[in-house]
Amino acid sequence: MVKLAFPRELRLLTPTHFTFVFQQPQRAGTPQITILGRLNALGHPRIGLTVAKKHVKRAHERNRIKRLTRESFRLRQHELPAMDFVIVAKKGIGELDNHALTEALEKLWRRHCRLARGS
């Protein structure tokens, strides 16, 4: 049975972790969301989220976006390459409903899997 937990080891926790990804990222994006990824040596993927107040004013909307993104990652974690991912929310992401956001994330996860295999 595959474990679908979301332990601390699967999160980017420090500014150093985020900076590592921002230095040489592989990008996959839509007009509302961008996923930056960089290969790591840990053998499993990790995720970090940035949802700025500038783009999503209300806290409950920012929390909804982060919750759906974490859930999408949690369900796909065993299919993803061993990369550190940073999800960057952009202007207009607040207008996406739950289904549209989930579909956009699935598309971007698939694109990152292809990018990792190609490199």
Curated annotation (Swiss-Prot):
EC id: 3.1.26.5
Enzyme class, UniProt record, top EC level: hydrolase
Stored Pfam families: Ribonuclease_P
An MF annotation (GO) of this entry: tRNA binding
Catalytic function, reaction form: Endonucleolytic cleavage of RNA, removing 5'-extranucleotides from tRNA precursor
SUPFAM superfamilies reported in the protein's UniProt record: Ribosomal protein S5 domain 2-like
One GO BP annotation of this record: tRNA 5'-leader removal
Superkingdom assignment: Bacteria
Keywords attached to this entry: Endonuclease, Hydrolase, Nuclease, RNA-binding, tRNA processing
A single GO cellular-component term on record: ribonuclease P complex
HAMAP family per UniProt: RNase_P
Family, as annotated: Belongs to the RnpA family.
Function (record text): RNaseP catalyzes the removal of the 5'-leader sequence from pre-tRNA to produce the mature 5'-terminus. It can also cleave other RNA substrates such as 4.5S RNA. The protein component plays an auxiliary but essential role in vivo by binding to the 5'-leader sequence and broadening the substrate specificity of the ribozyme.
UniProt xrefs under PANTHER family: RIBONUCLEASE P PROTEIN COMPONENT
Subunit structure: Consists of a catalytic RNA component (M1 or rnpB) and a protein subunit.
Protein name (Swiss-Prot/TrEMBL): Ribonuclease P protein component
